[in-house]
């Protein structure tokens, strides 16, 4: 067979294979055209699940008479004219393929009138060459599209249609999604002459929750947590259901929109799932209705035939932004206040990944982990489920070890000055600048040391805490601040805001930079030791601590932070121990000369040697 140009009708039918999957696809394309035309009311009439009739009527701007023929031609559009337009799409449609593709597999008529015209005109395409006929018609300002006998000329496609009920359910779902995207538009849906859905427009500043409840149900509305999150050109709004009360029925509600366009994007879903994972079971899914607004130049919508997917130019930034936005609203729902100074502190543990600072986008579900105890375990309220473990947590210390270390990690009185540790062990030689040689690691968190023939055990977490305290305590110059990739925004009370403002200069010396407004505080930078911490937990604790203080000394605040930082290591290796001791010997020489209690313990081998000799 020789190479030849395909007839227009056949070419359009091939294109329809990508655009027109089922009646719901037709409804989606036509309703989006109505929205692009500025319609505030859209009426949708369906017969026999869309196989017999799809009629879309709107009150948009309409189409001029001399443009009707072009409207039914392939690659004819009013929405873009250059590559620059394509790279900054703000309309829902832009390819100019929908009407031509639909008309090639159905009997389509387009009737329209603009406000400037005195009469309406009707256009339809027919024949092998898809010639367009235009004739006068009666119609108000706006456009009506009728699609009759879908797939009448492609029997192979028609036989793949499901039952009337199934096809209409897909149409109903599409309308639900569109109604959630445009609260300002009235949408009416009827099937076989019976009105099925009536979504009335919500005025500016009106109660969007009414339409949300009508579409997603009262169960979702009762558990919905409102989100309002912004950073630069990124804005996240919407609702996420409380993960503690998620049900299988609620989990079906997963609606996401990017610049008003409904999406099924893996990156967005992964960010939301990761934010909720500590409260969800392995077989549970989050429920959400979220709207992401982003600079059109930073997103490519021309990557999927049906425009269901997008590609972000800065996917890592978008992922972390959504993750933090969802996580922040979940953190604000904690019903029990976090324990501060009066509760026993657990032993340090390994750090969960901080999405605020880390900036890495692992586009895969985290590996399965064994359940571990949560960082805080307040008594659950009656009828509520126990608190879920924090992700990435590792087993902590034994109870006896934790009690010993807890006693060492007590916050000093507010007026107490930062002092060098009191010697609890015999002082080393005056010229000593080393703890000795690391022989091995004992019980995963103690280093067995040898120096001048003497053996001792060193508690690595305690050494790590003292090192951090020195790193956090400002010297002649303030501690260097490390800007966060995405600032952390938290809601604070009036008392907490007042305490933060009083402590602002002290916090600035520690490298903590923040900005406050009426009811929120935005953390913009933290010192290096805090970069890999979970700031969603640490910063609210710090604010609570400051609210109870009357004097704000950088040294006391640094000591409190050092006490509350989580350990970087669940199990220490020889290399990690050697590196830590080298840093301690360099930055904390007083610990070498006068070890504090709980840091170093001499090991007397004489009883063991004597016992061996007696044998």
Swiss-Prot record:
Q: Where is the composition biased (Low complexity)?
A: 364-391
Q: Which CDD domains match?
A: HATPase_MutL-MLH-PMS-like, MutL_Trans_MutL
Keywords, ordered alphabetically:
DNA damage, DNA repair
SUPFAM superfamilies found in the cross-reference section? ATPase domain of HSP90 chaperone/DNA topoisomerase II/histidine kinase, DNA mismatch repair protein MutL, Ribosomal protein S5 domain 2-like
Disulfide bonding pattern of the chain: none
The yes or no answer to whether the keyword Secreted is present is no
- HAMAP family, alphabetically? DNA_mis_repair
- The protein's role, per its UniProt record: This protein is involved in the repair of mismatches in DNA. It is required for dam-dependent methyl-directed DNA mismatch repair. May act as a 'molecular matchmaker', a protein that promotes the formation of a stable complex between two or more DNA-binding proteins in an ATP-dependent manner without itself being part of a final effector complex.
Q: What is this protein identified as? A: DNA mismatch repair protein MutL
Q: Which organism is it from?
A: Shigella boydii serotype 4 (strain Sb227)
């Amino acid at each position: 067979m020789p190479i030849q140009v395909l007839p227009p009708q056949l070419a359009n039918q091939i294109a329809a294979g990508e655009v027109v999957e089922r009646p719901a696809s037709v409804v989606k394309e036509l309703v989006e055209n109505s929205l692009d035309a500025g319609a505030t009311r859209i009426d949708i009439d369906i017969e026999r699940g869309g196989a017999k009739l799809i009629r879309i009527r709107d009150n948009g701007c309409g189409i001029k008479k001399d443009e009707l023929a072009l409207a039914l031609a392939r690659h004819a559009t009013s929405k873009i004219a250059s590559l620059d337009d394509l790279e900054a799409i703000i309309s829902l449609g832009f390819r100019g393929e929908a009407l031509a593709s639909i008309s090639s597999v159905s009997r389509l008529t387009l009737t329209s009138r603009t406000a400037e015209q005195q009469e309406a005109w009707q256009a339809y395409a027919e024949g092998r060459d898809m010639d367009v006929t235009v004739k006068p018609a009666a119609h108000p300002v706006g456009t009506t599209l009728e699609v009759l006998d879908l797939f009448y000329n492609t029997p192979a496609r028609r036989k793949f249609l499901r039952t009337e009920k199934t096809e209409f359910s897909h149409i109903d779902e599409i309308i639900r999604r569109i109604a959630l995207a445009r609260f300002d538009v009235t949408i009416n849906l009827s099937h076989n002459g019976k009105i099925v859905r009536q979504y009335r427009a919500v005025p500016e500043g009106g109660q969007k929750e009414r339409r949300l409840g009508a579409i997603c149900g009262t169960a979702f509305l009762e558990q919905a947590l409102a989100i309002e999150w912004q950073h630069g050109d990124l804005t996240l709004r919407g609702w996420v259901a409380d993960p503690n009360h998620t049900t299988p029925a609620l989990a079906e509600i997963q609606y996401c929109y990017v610049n008003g366009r409904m999406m099924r994007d893996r990156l967005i879903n992964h960010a939301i799932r990761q934010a909720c994972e500590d409260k969800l079971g392995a077989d549970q899914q989050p429920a959400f209705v979220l709207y992401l607004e982003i600079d059109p130049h930073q997103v490519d919508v021309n990557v999927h035939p049906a425009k269901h997917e997008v590609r972000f130019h800065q996917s890592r930034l978008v992922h972390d932004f959504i993750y933090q936005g969802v996580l922040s609203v979940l953190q604000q729902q904690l019903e029990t206040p976090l324990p501060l100074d009066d509760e026993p502190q657990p032993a340090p543990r390994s750090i969960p990944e901080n999405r605020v600072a880390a900036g890495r986008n692992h586009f895969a579900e985290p590996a399965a982990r064994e359940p571990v105890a949560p960082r805080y375990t307040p008594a659950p309220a009656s009828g509520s489920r126990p608190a879920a473990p924090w992700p990435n947590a590792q087993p902590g210390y034994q109870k006896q070890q934790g009690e010993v270390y807890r006693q060492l990690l007590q916050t000093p009185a507010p007026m107490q000055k930062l002092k060098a540790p009191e010697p609890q062990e015999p002082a080393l030689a005056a010229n000593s600048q080393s703890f000795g040689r690391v022989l091995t690691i004992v019980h995963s968190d103690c280093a067995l040391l040898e120096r001048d023939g003497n053996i001792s055990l060193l508690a690595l977490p305690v050494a790590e805490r003292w090192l951090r305290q020195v790193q956090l305590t400002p010297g002649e110059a303030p501690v260097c601040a490390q800007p966060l990739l995405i600032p952390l925004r938290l809601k604070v009370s009036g008392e907490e805001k007042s305490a933060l403002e009083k402590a602002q200069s002290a916090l600035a010396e520690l490298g903590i930079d923040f900005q406050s407004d009426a009811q929120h505080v935005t953390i913009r930078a933290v010192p290096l030791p805090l970069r890999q911490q979970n700031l969603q937990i640490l910063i609210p604790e710090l604010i609570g601590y400051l609210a109870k203080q009357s004097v704000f000394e950088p040294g006391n605040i640094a000591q409190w932070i050092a006490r509350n930082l989580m350990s970087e290591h669940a199990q220490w290796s020889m290399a990690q121990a050697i590196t830590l001791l080298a840093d301690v010997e360099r930055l904390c020489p007083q610990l070498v000369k006068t070890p504090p209690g709980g840091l170093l313990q001499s090991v007397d081998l004489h009883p063991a040697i004597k016992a061996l000799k007696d044998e």
